[in-house]
Amino acid sequence: MDTQNTPIHVNLWHRDFWRLCFANLLLMTSVYMLILGIPYFMTKEGYRPWQVGVVVGAYGLGIFLLGGFCSYLVQRYRRNRVCQFSICCVAVCHVVLYYLDTFWNIKFGFEVLVAMRVVLGAFLGLAQMTLASTLVIDTCESFQRTEANYITSWFARFSIATGPVLVWLICTFFNMRLTFPVAFLLALGALVLVSRVKFPFKAPADHMPLFSSDRFFLPQGIPLFVNIVLIMASAGMYFAIPHNLTVYLMLLAGLVVAVIAEKYVFADADLKSQVVVGLILIGAAEFVSLNDQDFAVEVLVPVLLGLGMGVIGSRFLLFYIKLAKHCQRGTSTSSFFLAWELGITLGIALGFVLQDSACQHLPGEHSVIFNSTIHELLYPGMILTGLSLILYNFLVHPWYMKHRNR
């Protein structure tokens, strides 16, 4: 399948598959709610933006910590139990500090916040590696697995917009302090959905090393990994800039347009075109962001960004799947997840580090989510986008065409 014309099998959309897709959406939405939640409360407590960036970035480190044990855990124990335990730990991470602060008036320092984000990332990474890379595959036939990976990745991708949108709705109609309890409830919802799916028992392998790259990281995909990280870092810097509700709604609209474009615009397009167009769209969004007109900043920019991120994400996922050898599908999807999340997290963290004075533009605790666009962050993003385009066009794509296996 060299094009994006992924076949649709109606019988794939059974009840268990729906449950896993929405579990993926709820879980990742609970995580992306913290894009606004963490800066808001840390700024309220007097932390500097660089400290906010470090706390946000710690998640990107955490997602790698338990990946090497994933293969052992899903074979030593029932794979759905591993996923459920991981999601449960994510839910606890969402609410534990909030609970101790609100009901026991226990304050935690910067180091504890960093450690908690690392732990959250570790269990979220394990949950994703078992859910999207293992359990989803177990619910479908072998000829449907590429389609299943493609669909479930889209549910996770939508969370980039649904998480911040939900926080804005909480802020508008309720109170920002409900952000973490709501994230906790979403994670519990994901846990319930996964628990409702029945999985057959699979006998473990005879020899199971405690640590391995299986279901964790695809070594032969390092060029793809680096390229994705650079692309998503440039896009991630946009999320370090304060935006209003309209922006995130338009970002969601851009992602929806990307789904439609993949089906009708890129269905029979050249293999290279999708990533190139996506990078051009991201670059255009960054360029238009320099404009001070409200329509351009609040509507056009997020639509272009969402469209670019959407078409790039789907194409690179398929690249990873085609690069994998026999029985490495789960490993390839996990590697894509790691690259995607690491890139976005690094971009957001770098954005906060670069805008150390951002919270001083408007007084008060709401400044972190109501500030105007900070143009200085766009220039490094544009440089990363240009570098990513050159890297993909002249190095990564020719390398991929030479090394793909499917």
Region annotations inferred by a language model:
Residues 54-73, 252-262:
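Central cavity-lining transmembrane alpha-helices of secondary-active solute carriers
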Residues 272-316:
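C-terminal transmembrane helical hairpin of 12-TM major facilitator-type secondary transporters
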Residues 144-168, 336-349:
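Glycine-rich segments within core transmembrane alpha-helices of 12-TM secondary carriers
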Residues 324-367:
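A late C-terminal transmembrane helix in Major Facilitator Superfamily
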Residues 88-107, 280-294:
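C-terminal ends and interior cores of transmembrane alpha-helices
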Residues 116-155:
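Cytoplasmic helix-loop-helix junction between adjacent transmembrane helices
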Residues 177-196, 375-398:
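Symmetry-related core transmembrane helices of the 12-TM Major Facilitator Superfamily/SLC fold
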Residues 5-60, 220-250:
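Helix-loop boundary and gating motifs at the non-cytosolic
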